[in-house]
Curated annotation (Swiss-Prot):
The lineage of its organism: Viruses, Duplodnaviria, Heunggongvirae, Peploviricota, Herviviricetes. GO terms for biological process: fusion of virus membrane with host plasma membrane; symbiont entry into host cell. Residues 1-24 form the signal peptide. Glycans are attached at N77, N162, N542, N604, N627. This is Envelope glycoprotein H. It is found in: Virion membrane; Host cell membrane; Host endosome membrane. The gene is gH. Disulfide bonds: none annotated.
Length: 686
């Protein structure tokens, strides 16, 4: 007989027994009998109101749960009811291990500084819709009626992450397949435990002394690390009432969970995210409004961080939404259009031009050493890799690879270390996207010696899919642990795993720098490089029939400078600098006439990568052409004259004519004076 067929009669017997016990308890007290509540937890319309405290029992087998109203709390002393409470179909008291008095928490959580609020002039949206009344049930606390404002869940066989936001209420559940679960409840009202009669009927769940809210942490006290985690997360909500500070802490905690996989980091990051959303919703609920950029920021961060956390737990899932339709209806500022398109999974076609322009502008600023918006770049890259054509994806990766320099990777690593510091203070907003972009979404892998950056890159590439896309919320049991396709690898599938750096070309081929020769494709061994770190430049493609196993040496040349101001001869070429130590210093895509002129300006160039005076004598340069030609660049044969405007030519001609006229007049004056002077002298003598 199937197991499900056996469980059904047992459930019915259990329900019947509980109803009988309820009737017996009610008759013993002389109280009117009431009908059972609905499966959703609400009382039946015909139920009479209970007198005094009422006992609720949570019944279920994991797939469905029901709440039944039995009677007064004194019924707990009934051995028959106690037997049911300890039965197979009911929850266990051991969720919170006794003695509760042994638990201790941080007494006065430290306050973090308040960050700047929404930008001035930001459009405000109403946040005054009442929550939907629901009964919140848990394993060890009596059910509570909550006005739910938001409810989100990410689930797969490896992990479950659930957040319920209500009016002055947060319920958060986290569970991992290989570790014990954790639950956090934040409430304005005091709550009571479902505890054995020996502990009393008015026992408060474990938590720190009440501040603005009551905070309860429920879990199995398995070891000291779990105990410390439960103590720490209980203090989060009282650390700051600024949602930006809480979001910054959530990003840092998610960063720790991604680079240092483990249940405790996962739990801390999940609670941080839930608390950040709770602090924001409470502020918006009290003010009855919220700024549109702030609501979009919280919504997008919730979806992004939940996906990164679930990915770290081993499954492709994440929140499909937090504030339901509230965030989707907000007006979007021009600067937030890419974030909104990624967050809500909108049709990306209307945003592709904006995404291309964002990547191009970020690249132009990066080449000139100027700061750029790394968060906007992340969302632009996400849209182009997922919705753009093959040409869009490859050109985007070419630019992000060029933007990923050793200096930028070092800055990201330093930012990561600072964020992971236990003494980090969020004086300024911190976002994971400032660490992820652009190196994590590029084809540069030689800077990934730090496992932190390598883990971040893998997580970031899998988070590029739009958060609102179908299947982003939860994974089914059948396909939950199937590996998601890496959009970066999909855009350039020909690149081998051992590549240090790759530069995709149009047509399905790529320039690839490696330490050893690939199995297929022409390869150039770069001379003057340390034999311990050799550099090989190969051209690889997916066309196995065209495999050319040819070893070559790049030809050293003085390339001609172009004098044509209207033709860009070296556009779409890639300029590469590398050192004799076998290190790739930088790559620059020449995409405009202005960049070409800067390239040929030599020591006068304002682009640092092109200026040879900023590099030592052991640094060499290559020019990679789109047709696969590789040149060891020595110099340009001549310096191109600066373009002269027509107005300057006219002014020069007029000035020269005036100068000639003045000189001629002076000459005539001198000649006339000399002629008259000699005539007078001759006449005087005669």
């Amino acid at each position: 007989m199937p197991a499900s067929s056996v469980r059904l009669p047992l459930r019915l017997l259990t329900l019947a027994g509980l109803l009988a016990l309820a009737g017996a308890a009610a008759l013993a007290r002389g109280a009117p009998q009431g009908g059972p509540p609905s499966p959703q937890g609400g009382p039946a319309p015909t139920a009479a109101p209970a007198r005094g405290p009422t006992l609720f029992v949570l019944v279920g087998d994991g797939s469905a749960w029901f709440v039944f109203q039995l009677g007064g709390l004194g019924a707990l002393n009934d051995t028959r009811i106690r037997g049911h409470l300890l039965g197979r179909y009911l929850v266990s008291y051991q969720v919170v291990p006794p003695p509760v008095s042994a638990w201790y928490f941080v007494q006065r959580p430290r306050e973090r500084p308040r960050l700047s609020g929404p930008p001035s002039g930001a459009e405000l949206v109403a946040f005054d819709a009442p929550g939907v009344r629901r009964t919140y049930t848990t394993a060890a606390v009596w059910p509570a009626e909550v006005a739910v404002l938001a409810d989100a869940e990410a689930r797969c066989p490896a992990a479950v992450f659930n957040v319920t936001l209500g009016e002055a209420f947060l319920g958060l559940r986290v569970a991992l397949r290989s570790f014990l679960p954790l639950e956090v409840i934040i409430s304005a009202e005091r709550m009571r435990m479902i505890a054995p009669p020996a502990l009393g009927s008015d026992l408060e769940p474990p938590g720190p002394p009440a501040g603005r809210f009551h905070v309860y942490t429920l879990g199995f006290l398995s070891d000291g690390a779990m105990h410390q985690t439960m103590r720490d997360v209980a203090a989060y909500v009282h650390e700051s009432d600024d949602y930006l500070a809480q979001l910054s802490a959530a990003h840092a905690a998610a960063l720790a969970a991604v680079v240092q996989p483990g249940p405790y980091y996962f739990y801390r990051a999940a609670v941080r995210l839930g608390v950040a959303a709770f602090v924001f919703s409470e502020a918006a609920r009290r003010d009855r409004r919220a700024s549109a950029p702030a609501l979009l920021r919280v919504e997008s961060d919730a979806r992004l961080l939940s996906r990164l956390l679930m990915r770290a737990a081993g499954c492709p899932a994440g929140f499909a939404g937090l504030f339901d339709g509230r965030a989707e209806r907000v007006p979007v500022a021009p600067a937030d259009q890419l974030r909104a398109a990624w967050t809500f999974g909108e049709d990306p076609a209307p945003r592709l031009d904006l995404a291309r322009a964002t990547v191009a502008e970020a690249y132009r600023r990066s080449v000139r050493g100027k700061p750029f918006d790394q968060q906007a770049l992340f969302f632009a890259v996400a849209l182009l890799l997922r919705a753009g054509g093959p040409g869009d994806a490859r050109e985007t990766l070419l630019r992000t690879t060029a933007m990923c320099t050793a200096e930028r990777a070092a800055a990201a690593a330093e930012l990561t270390r600072a964020a992971l510091s236990p003494t980090a203070a969020w004086n300024e907003p911190f976002s994971l996207l400032d660490v992820l972009s652009p190196c994590a979404v590029s084809l540069r892998r030689d800077l990934g010696g730090d496992a932190t950056l390598a883990n971040l890159g893998a997580a970031a590439r899998l988070a590029l899919a739009p958060a609102g896309a179908p299947g982003a919320a939860a994974a089914t049991d059948e396909g939950a642990e199937e590996e998601e396709e890496d959009p970066v690898a999909r855009a350039a599938p020909e690149i081998p795993a051992e590549a240090l750096l790759a530069l995709p070309l149009r047509g399905g081929a790529s320039f690839v720098f490696t330490r050893r020769r690939p199995d297929c494709g022409p390869a150039y061994t770069l001379g003057g490089v340390d034999i311990a770190n050799p550099l090989v430049l190969a051209i690889v493609s997916n066309d196995s029939a065209a495999c050319d196993y040819t070893d070559r040496m790049p030809e050293s040349q003085h390339l001609p400078a172009t004098d044509n101001p209207s033709v860009c001869v070296y556009c779409d070429c890639v300029f590469v600098r590398y050192s004799s130590a076998g290190t790739i210093l930088e790559t620059v895509l020449i995409e405009s006439k202005d960049m070409e002129e800067q390239l040929m300006a030599g020591a006068n160039s304002t682009i640092p990568s092109f200026n040879p005076t900023l590099h030592g004598g052991d640094v060499k340069a290559l020019m990679l052409f789109p047709n696969g030609t590789v040149v060891d660049l020595l110099s340009f044969t001549s310096t191109r004259l600066a373009p002269v405007s027509p107005a300057y030519v006219v002014a020069s001609v007029v000035g020269a004519a005036i100068t000639v006229g003045i000189l001629y007049a002076l000459f005539k004056m001198l000649c006339s004076f000399s002629s008259e002077g000699y005539s007078r002298l001759i006449n005087a003598r005669s």
